[in-house]
Amino acid sequence: MKSFKSLTVAASISAFALPAFAAEEVVIGVPSWPGAQAIAHVLGEIVTSRIGGAVEYVPGNNAAIFQAMDQGKGEIDVHSDVWLPNQQSFVDEFVTGKGTVTLSSNPYVGNQGLCVSKDFSTKMNVTDITDLGRPEVAAAMDSDGNGKGEMWIGAPGWASANVNEVKVRDYGLLDFIEPIRAEEAVMTARIKDSIAKGEGFAFYCYEPHAIWFMFDVVMLNEPPHDPAKYVMVQPDNDPDWYNKSMVASKDSDKDVQIAWSTSLAERSPTIAEFFANFELTAQDVSQMAYEMTANGRTPEEVAKQWVEANAERVDTMLGL
């Protein structure tokens, strides 16, 4: 890992940031899910408290953040939580193709699938994704009386929501299940409500996430990941994505990492070098997301606490 000589000097000055660092700035893109918000503020906290730089946070979906990073003008400089292969189309275009975005080589491992509460799983003997197609199970998940059980497949703008919409079709569940897109807070409230009422509810779930600390839930079994049965075309690649996709197996494990505008190395080189060394674990992200979602703490609060509690790890990221 490269040594940051200038950072060593800066680290010895507790009350003031050097003017050279004050000149460096970064705009951090903040996706909607709690883990991404937590990571965004960890990045920002380290930039401000340890590097002495200036930080701005801009909310946005995946497409907007990648397009802004591609422009390289500082409108948005970094995406805090890139899931691959979910967002592979953006990486193919902007990282591999145009080279305008740089992808971190320090990912943590993510997992995703479809879940129900443990109580509902036990009560209705629901352990496999195909169990959602049993009429009595679908009826127990139908809260609005339209004849179909509800399944939250993700938030608007999420690539994973598109994957799950195709999954519902290709697992033969469309006659029984209604795919729903809504913000994640709606999903969390619905899970809590369904457990309290003893109702069924299926939902997209992933690790790391606060959900595993908040509720007793189980991920449903799916056929093992098979590339031949997992051909996903995203809308930004083809408007006929739904008809050209086929997803009938479990998602592969995910590599999750940050990505930043390649031009940041010229505009804010110290920050860019820190980004290249930045590294978290799935456990880090789950715990911070839990503090936000279950305990009502702000991303700023959990990020500051994490940075203070992990000073040695931060030192390593800064080359100290």
Give the label of every model feature segment.
Residues 33-34, 54-70, 179-190:
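Short helix-initiation/N-cap motifs at beta->coil->alpha
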Residues 213-274, 278:
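C-terminal lobe and pocket-closing loops
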Residues 99-152:
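A conserved helix-loop-strand patch within extracytoplasmic ligand-binding domains
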Residues 68, 76-81, 152-231:
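Ligand-binding pocket segment of bilobal, Venus flytrap-like solute-binding proteins
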Residues 62-118:
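N-terminal segment of the mature folded domain
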Residues 35-53, 166-168:
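Short, polar/charged alpha-helical segment
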Residues 23-35, 53-58, 148-152, 275:
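Short, well-ordered beta-strand elements
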Residues 112-122, 255-267, 291:
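A bilobed periplasmic-binding-protein/Venus flytrap-type ligand-binding module shared by bacterial periplasmic
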